[in-house]
Amino acid sequence: MKLQASWSLIAVALLAFRADADGTAWDLEIVPLKPGIYLLQRPEPLRQPVEGNVLVIVNERDVVVFEGGGMPIAADNAIRLIRSITSKPVSHLVNSHWHGDHNLGNQVYRAEYPGITIVAHPATRAAMLGPPFKYVTEFDKDVGPTITEWTALKEKGELSERRSRLLDDLNLLLTDAKRIAVTPPDLTVADELVLHRGEREIHIRHLGKGNTEGDLVLWLPRERIVATGDLVVHPIPYGFGSFPREWIDTLAGIEALDFELLVPGHGEVQRDRSYLELLRTMLAAMRVQAADAVAKGLDLEATRKALDFSAFAPKFPQDDMGKRLFEAWWTSPISRSLWLEASGKPIVQADAGENN
C-alpha cells in the first residue's frame, strides 16, 4: 500500500489502532522460517500506518533482504534485528514495488551497507522518480493539521486514549519523514534475476502486473519459500491502483510454484494455497460483475454500488474494524480499477492514491 496519510485514512487509522498497542507502528520481531531464513514482521498487520514484512536471507558470505521498510525508522529497526542474527553484510536489497511502505528505508540500508545493490522492476524505479512519489514530500501538509488539532485536545485532557496513542505515531512519522531521501534501485529486473549463493538459488521474478505495474516476487526453490510483496496481503488485501485481469494471471503464476511457505507483503505467513485461491477467485468473479455494469452504461460510482462482494466478504475479518478496512483497502479501490479495466480506460499508477 502506498504509505499515505492524507487521512480520510486518519479515520481508518483509528479503526485499525488498539489503545493498548505496544511500541511504535514500525517495531518488528524476528520469526525464523527455515535455517538462514527469517521474517521480520510487525505483530499487528492491520495497524496504521501500515508496515510491510521483511524477508532476510542469510547466505555463506552475505545477506539478501526483500523489502526496504516503510520509513527510515523501520529500516533502523530491521537492520538492528539483522545484526542480532548475523554480522554478514547486506549485499542486495529488493523492493517488491513502488509503494513507499516497501522502500522508504532504502537510504538507511545504503548508508549502513555502502556496497549494497538495490533491486526493483523498471516500473518501480520510474514511479519512485516520477509523479507517484510526490506524496512523499507532503507528509506535513497531510498530517500536520490533525497533529495540531489533536495536540490541542490532548493538552486540555479531551483526547481519547486511542487517539493519544495514534498521535504519538503520527508525531514520530512526521519527524522521521524529514530523514527520507528517495533512493531508487540501481539494478532493474524486467523478467528474472537469479543470485547464486552456494547451493542456494534466489530467484527475483516479475510474473506480471497485479497490485502495481512492476511487482517482483522472490522465490527460493530449495527452501520452497515465496515472498510476494503486496500481490498477496493478509488478512485484508490492498486494491489501490491495481490491474485486475493481469493480477489473476500473476496469482496463478505464484500458485504454480512448488512453495511450502508464502510470505505476503503484510500479515501472517501462509502455509497453503487457500488464501491465494480466494484472492484469485474473488478477482475473477468481480471482473464479470464489472463487465456487466459497464455494459449497462454505469459510471464509476454506480458501478461501485452495483458490485456485490457479499459472497467473499465473510471470508475476511468480520468485526467492525475488519468490515470498514475491507471497504477502505479493498472494495472501494479495486472497484475503481475494475471499472476502468472494463471501460477500456488506462489504469495510471500516479492516480492510485488520488482517485480511490
Where are these regions (language model features)?
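Conserved beta-strand hairpin/beta-sheet module of binuclear metal-dependent hydrolase folds
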Residues: 31-84, 216-230
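Divalent-metal (often Zn2+) His-rich catalytic cores of metallo-beta-lactamase-fold enzymes
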Residues: 225, 248-302
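Active-site HxH/HxHxD metal-binding segment of metal-dependent hydrolases
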Residues: 83-185, 194, 288
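Active-site neighborhood of phospho(di)ester-bond hydrolases with catalytic His/Asp-centered motifs
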Residues: 66-68, 91-99, 119-122, 207, ...
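Core dinuclear metal-dependent hydrolase active-site scaffold
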Residues: 178-184, 188-220
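Bacterial N-terminal signal peptides
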Residues: 7-16
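Boundary at the C-terminal end of the N-terminal hydrophobic targeting segment
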Residues: 16-25
